[in-house]
């Protein structure tokens, strides 16, 4: 938000202000094209913003390195470079907006008001409207309704379960009813998992669609791209979510393999209780552990590639429109 505001401050009077001071006509009296002059103003604003941000990043990086919170590496350097590149994109977007307001306004006072209106709409209103957009345009089922469906699925399974499916005798693991109980518990677990996983997927789609709408703002695009650059945020969450589902299968496979080796177990897998599976302890070091794997550059870039293209298109479209207007601009 601050970067976007600073970029607008550097450009809102770049044309209208110079027109008022009569320096714009003087500049164009030299052998320099309007496109070159406009692009020079645009580029100087972006570089100025990047210089300010780079100084802050450098100070923060030095503090982190001195305190030992991180060590310098190629990966860290790449993340810093990616962050600065994304910052340059959002600065370019709002610099283009600032030049646009400066070209269409008759004087610098009006261009300032127009630039502030653009900043409030694209920098504040749209990014903070995500909750309204999600609830209004992409509503999903409430958690209470999901729980009711889970309870209904449990009731249906219980009604159709064979007699004895709830019998249990912890002293006799080979009790025949334990197999029925294990089958029922497995079905209950799978039914709940299917319902909740489907609900979570609708939540993911709601979030993604809402973010697509709020991506009309370069500030939202900046957030999405910086998350990808740092390997954090929603991109990281989805990767961990998918990896945890893989780990679930690995852990279950480990337990079943452990159970098969126990001759005192009837091998009736019960996900809730150990009445019909092995009760022998397992060595801690043999249990599969979940470890978060670092995201590769491709894994970070792939989910946000469209966002990156949209941001670049944003900058080009606004600047091109500004250029067309500036070519016809009366500098007198």
Predicted regions and their residues:
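Transmembrane alpha-helical segments and their membrane-interface loop/helix boundaries
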Residues: 1, 109-332
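Short helix-to-coil transition segments within interhelical loops
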Residues: 26-34
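Alpha-helical transmembrane segments of multi-pass membrane transport proteins
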Residues: 4, 17, 51-52, 89-90, ...
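Alpha-helix N-cap/helix-start motif at helix boundaries, enriched for small hydrophobics
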Residues: 35-41, 326
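Secretory targeting signals
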Residues: 40-103, 143-169, 293
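Short alpha-helical transmembrane interface motifs in multi-pass membrane proteins
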Residues: 5-9, 48, 78-83, 303-307
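Hydrophobic/aromatic residues in alpha-helical transmembrane segments
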Residues: 7-11, 96-97, 113, 322
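Long, hydrophobic alpha-helical segments
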Residues: 1-17, 21
């Amino acid at each position: 938000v601050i970067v976007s505001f600073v970029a607008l401050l550097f450009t809102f009077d770049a044309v209208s202000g110079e027109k008022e001071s009569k320096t714009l006509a003087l500049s164009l009296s030299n052998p320099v094209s309007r496109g070159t002059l406009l692009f020079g103003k645009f580029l100087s604003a972006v570089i100025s913003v990047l210089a300010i941000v780079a100084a802050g990043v450098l100070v923060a990086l030095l503090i982190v390195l001195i305190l030992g919170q991180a060590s310098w590496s190629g990966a860290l350097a790449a993340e810093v470079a990616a962050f600065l590149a994304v910052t340059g994109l959002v600065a370019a977007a709002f610099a283009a907006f600032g030049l646009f307001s400066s070209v269409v306004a008759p004087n610098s006072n009006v261009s300032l008001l127009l630039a502030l209106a653009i900043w409030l709409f694209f920098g504040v209103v749209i990014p903070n409207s995500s909750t309204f957009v999600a609830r209004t345009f992409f509503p999903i089922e409430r958690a209470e309704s999901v729980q009711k469906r889970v309870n209904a699925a449990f009731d249906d399974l219980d009604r159709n379960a064979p007699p004895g499916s709830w019998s249990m005798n912890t002293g006799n693991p080979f009790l025949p009813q334990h197999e029925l109980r294990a089958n029922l518990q497995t079905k209950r677990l799978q039914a709940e998992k299917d319902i909740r996983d489907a609900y979570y997927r609708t939540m993911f789609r709601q979030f993604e669609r809402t973010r697509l709408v709020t991506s009309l703002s370069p500030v939202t695009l900046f957030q999405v791209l910086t998350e990808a650059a740092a390997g954090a945020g929603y991109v990281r969450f989805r990767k961990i979510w998918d990896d945890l589902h893989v780990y679930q299968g690995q852990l279950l496979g480990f337990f079943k393999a452990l159970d098969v080796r126990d001759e005192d177990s009837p091998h009736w897998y019960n996900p809730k209780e150990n009445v019909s599976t092995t009760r022998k302890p397992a060595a801690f070091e043999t249990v599969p552990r979940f470890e978060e794997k670092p995201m590769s550059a491709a894994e970070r870039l792939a989910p946000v590639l469209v966002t990156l293209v949209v941001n670049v298109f944003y900058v080009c479209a606004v600047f091109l429109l500004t250029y067309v207007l500036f070519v016809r601009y009366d500098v007198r």
